[in-house]
């Protein structure tokens, strides 16, 4: 194992020298003098090297490609962090392709038989030895079940964990060295990024997780005209083997075939946006790897086109609070209400509470005002989010993994939509959805549902307050004034109830007031909470 690690180190070093990645480090202006002086000790610095016309982004991309699949996937993850990376590097890393030669089909068969506990011929009436596709983590074979259904069988590459562990160790080492060496590198949080990648890559090795994600997504879009997700055959799924329905469709990037079958491209592009917002705001569960290779279009109804999604290894979800703040941020942004955007970032906890709202507002205005020089249809939602995150990053915004996945997915959907239909107006397509979502969120039914949930918690709050006051009075159990102390405790508990109702009513009223501009119903349930809270406080 140690010998393999040393060999890997020499390979990494050779690639670094070949693509002059050492120049990227030593060009840093704030590099400590002792580290900068190490450049003189590197023997290859004194050897003649051919000048390169490649950009720094291209050199980094080619180096990652040379280092193999684990580094390629890491580069793909990096490309989604546009809130951290310079644009030229992020654009180059987007070009990385996760394509590797297939492994021995007999090893795939052996692994399937080991996982299923049965011979391939006992499970499938046909199994194609030649793989349909091959990537760094797994490869896919076509097959037919004994019952006649056409399926695909996804198999994890054998012996992958030791390779991943070794490459991750080197990535962590490089990240830690970069953090110590450069202030700019520290701002990018490389160790944190490698940590995120470690979780992602190990999650992708568990195909049961992917199967569960696919089942959830299929259930969410059951009977929908927007998107179809293939069926998972759970009886044949194991940690290293996934069996699911084989789909037949047109790759979403095959414009010629889509045009030949007279697909409604405008509707297809708009439905892509609707799929995104449905996943994010209705389901709070979204496919986070919607690049063109994972998206197909059904051939059944070209006049009412339906997407087909595969490969659900990476998904994201948002809390109700994240959904709410995201919707309000988008609405406030398109109203050019930058103070509201700044305040929402602070209220949500995305930036520290001590952030000066005026300074944050000014920074957002400086970055975002130029965007509105374009027509609304030319404004990129993904770019808006990216610029907001970049600005917030300067004010110590904490990394929100779910928002990073969201931004990546939105950029994919948006790019795809405009490729299908260049005149796609994302805001006009999204606005009705956001209006409907805000209206439903603050409808009387939804508000009463929230009140019901809060009311269920009120007895617990009262009991907790009373118990606390009784514990505080324990040293005085023989005190003749104990009954009066208990009555005081009850009054304090009711005051706390009143304060809770008052606060909850204020929050609901504020939300409903904001939704009112989007044609939401009146917020009278919130006023009931405010009145009840005020009554309890005054009465006690």
Curated annotation (Swiss-Prot):
Topology relative to the membrane: Multi-pass membrane protein
Enzyme class per UniProt: transferase
EC number: 2.7.-.-
Localization per Swiss-Prot or TrEMBL: Cell inner membrane
Pathway per the UniProt entry: Cofactor biosynthesis; ubiquinone biosynthesis [regulation]
Single GO BP term: ubiquinone biosynthetic process
GO molecular function, one term: protein kinase activity
Major localization listed first in the record, in broad terms: membrane
Keyword presence, Cell inner membrane: yes
Residues of the active site: 289
Function: Is probably a protein kinase regulator of UbiI activity which is involved in aerobic coenzyme Q (ubiquinone) biosynthesis.
Family: Belongs to the ABC1 family. UbiB subfamily.
Protein name per the record: Probable protein kinase UbiB
Organism for this UniProt entry: Pseudomonas putida (strain GB-1)
Gene coding for it: ubiB
């Amino acid at each position: 194992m140690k010998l393999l690690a040393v060999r890997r180190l020499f390979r990494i070093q050779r690639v670094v020298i070949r693509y002059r990645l050492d120049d990227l480090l030593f060009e840093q202006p704030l590099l400590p003098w002792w580290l900068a002086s190490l450049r003189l000790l590197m023997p290859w610095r004194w050897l003649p090297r051919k000048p390169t016309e490649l950009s720094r982004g291209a050199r980094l991309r080619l180096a990652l490609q040379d280092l193999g699949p684990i580094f390629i996937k890491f580069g793909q993850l990096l490309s989604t962090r546009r809130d951290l990376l310079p644009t030229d590097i992020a654009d180059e890393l987007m070009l990385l392709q996760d394509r590797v030669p297939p492994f021995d089909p007999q090893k795939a068969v052996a692994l399937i038989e080991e996982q299923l506990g049965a011979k391939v011929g006992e499970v499938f009436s046909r199994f194609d030895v030649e793989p349909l596709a091959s990537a760094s983590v797994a490869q896919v074979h076509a097959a037919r079940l004994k019952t006649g259904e056409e399926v695909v069988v996804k198999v994890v590459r054998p012996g992958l964990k030791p390779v991943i562990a070794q490459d991750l160790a080197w990535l962590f080492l490089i990240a830690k060295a970069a953090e110590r060496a450069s202030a700019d590198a520290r701002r990018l949080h490389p160790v944190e990024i490698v940590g995120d990648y470690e979780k992602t890559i190990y999650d992708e090795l568990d195909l049961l997780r992917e199967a569960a994600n696919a089942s959830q997504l299929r259930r969410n879009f059951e009977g929908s005209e927007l998107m179809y997700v293939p069926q998972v055959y759970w009886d044949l799924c194991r940690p290293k083997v996934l069996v699911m329905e084989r789909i037949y469709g047109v790759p979403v990037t095959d414009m010629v075939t889509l045009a030949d079958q007279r697909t409604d491209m405008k509707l297809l592009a708009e439905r892509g946006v609707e799929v995104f917002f449905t996943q994010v705001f209705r389901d709070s569960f979204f496919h986070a790897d919607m690049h063109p290779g994972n998206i197909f279009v059904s051939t059944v109804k070209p006049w009412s086109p339906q997407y087909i999604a595969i490969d659900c290894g990476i998904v994201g979800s948002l809390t109700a609070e994240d959904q709410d703040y995201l919707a309000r941020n988008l609405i406030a942004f398109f109203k050019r209400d930058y103070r509201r955007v700044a305040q929402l970032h602070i209220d949500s906890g995305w930036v520290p509470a001590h952030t000066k709202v005026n300074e944050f507002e000014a920074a957002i205005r400086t970055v975002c005002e130029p965007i509105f020089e374009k027509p609304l249809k030319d404004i990129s939602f993904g770019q808006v989010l990216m610029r907001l995150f970049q600005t917030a990053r300067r004010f110590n915004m904490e990394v929100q993994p779910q928002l990073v996945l969201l931004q990546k997915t939105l950029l994919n959907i948006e790019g795809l939509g405009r490729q299908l239909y260049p005149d796609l107006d994302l805001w006009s397509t999204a606005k009705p959805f956001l209006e409907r979502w805000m209206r439903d969120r603050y409808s009387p039914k939804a508000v009463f549902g929230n009140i019901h949930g809060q009311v269920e918690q009120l007895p617990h709050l009262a009991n907790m307050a009373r118990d606390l006051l009784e514990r505080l009075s324990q040293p005085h159990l023989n005190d003749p004034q104990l009954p009066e102390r208990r009555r005081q405790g009850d009054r304090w508990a009711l005051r706390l109830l009143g304060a809770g109702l008052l606060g909850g009513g204020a929050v609901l009223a504020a939300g409903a007031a904001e939704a009112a501009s989007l044609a939401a119903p009146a917020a009278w349930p919130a006023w009931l909470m405010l009145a009840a809270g005020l009554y309890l406080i005054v009465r006690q």
